[in-house]
From Swiss-Prot:
Subunit description: Homotetramer.
Reactions this protein catalyses: UTP + L-glutamine + ATP + H2O = CTP + L-glutamate + ADP + phosphate + 2 H(+); L-glutamine + H2O = L-glutamate + NH4(+); UTP + NH4(+) + ATP = CTP + ADP + phosphate + 2 H(+)
Source species of the chain: Rhizobium etli (strain ATCC 51251 / DSM 11541 / JCM 21823 / NBRC 15573 / CFN 42)
Protein name in the entry: CTP synthase
A GO term, aspect molecular function: CTP synthase activity
Known function: Catalyzes the ATP-dependent amination of UTP to CTP with either L-glutamine or ammonia as the source of nitrogen. Regulates intracellular CTP levels through interactions with the four ribonucleotide triphosphates.
Amino acid sequence: MARYVFITGGVVSSLGKGIAAAALGALLQARGYRVRLRKLDPYLNVDPGTMSPTQHGEVFVTDDGAETDLDLGHYERFTGRSATRTDNITTGRIYKNIIDKERRGDYLGATVQVIPHVTNEIKDFVTEGNQDYDFVICEIGGTVGDIEAMPFMEAIRQLGNDLPRGTAVYVHLTLMPYIPAAGELKTKPTQHSVKELQALGIHPDILLVRADREIPEAERRKLSLFCNVRPSAVIQALDVANIYDVPMAYHKEGLDDEVLAAFGIEPAPKPRLDQWEEVCNRIRTPEGEVTIAIVGKYTGLKDAYKSLIEALHHGGIANRVKVKLEWIESEVFEKEDPAPYLEKVHGILVPGGFGERGSEGKIHAARFARERKVPYFGICFGMQMAVIEAARNLADVPDASSTEFGPAKEPVVGLMTEWVKGNELQKRTAAGDLGGTMRLGAYKAALKKGTKISDIYGSTDISERHRHRYEVNIDYKDRLESCGLVFSGMSPDGVLPETIEYPDHPWFIGVQYHPELKSRPLDPHPLFASFIEAATEQSRLV
């Protein structure tokens, strides 16, 4: 039978509930337990697929094609377990499900209310499909007191009574701020947060307290007394240099021991943390440093590229080097020469994106990398812009463009209207809805034997995750290949270009998919490991 850990947050948002959940999952896994992580999001969007990346951050795509919260990326990276669409739900999705049921008559004429219908829908989501797991960790988005989160708080309160005794534990993540004028950490915000949680009928078993310095023992006892938790259950969560230190830091503070004790699991299996120790050691003691320029259009919010950032650092871990990131707004290159910005970097990465804004700047970045022999990694939109650059400057197609930007004389990149998923033909139109209509999730690709990318993967058959509506037009393939650009990977039916490269370039690869979504600190993605290796070689030349 599965045991449930509910993680709530208080005082302020962005305290790191997702990292805490992921780290706890990793620690329980290290003891041999089977762990599942799920995220409950209070916003009214059905999913984050149509939300602005500068507001919400990255949309994390699962193998089965769900557009989910970026915290699922943390879950995957820390545990190595691939998430599914059933690991994330929003208030919007819950209400949509309920309205669909009401229209079908599933409620037999009953008045549909928040209690019991909304709360039952949440409880069903939390408890379904967990028979193969020892622990289910549920992160509740938002902060205690948010009106949007109230149905979720009520649902997990009810679950404390519905589930068998001893199978539900509540962890509350709070902030203990330091007041310079007083010269001390303050417990009052945490006390009030816990009181608000208790007023909702939820009594936390464990307090995970964020702080920027050691919490004195006297303050821990104070929190224990006023928040009604055991002294050992007041766990300090100190700031760390990087997120991959968190599992080891929380283990040192006893979080996993306290969770297991709350379930009555004593003595617990000893954890095997040697892999995490090795990762932390490689991060702390790099043997070199490389600088990677990220030429993007959402650089104002780094969370828009969360998985990408982490995958680059994974590449650094694989090569024992520190990866320094230079963020460049692509629109800059539409007005200025890219050379002063890119001459000293060791690699250029152009990530995914949508829309015409900044596209010409990305094309200029691709040209600089091609001509100057700087390692270039184009992902999704970044591959498309590299192909347009090749068409304009190598294949004598000066009007090459994408239909995403409007009518194009030479549509080198165009809207996909049909593609095959499994054995089914998928179709969409330009006038259709935006939500959930892209080529989403894991698709197979066939790599050309003897190409750089097939050597990197060590295989000609791969599966990677996609999120795009536009694709390189296969009608231009022959003209582009005659100029030296190789289409090194295609969809299994040979219709959709998946990867490109220049054989005479030290490292110039474009991929239509998002390899960053499958990279892990304990298992870096081969493309990122190879890209950082090439950047390390470049660093010896610059």
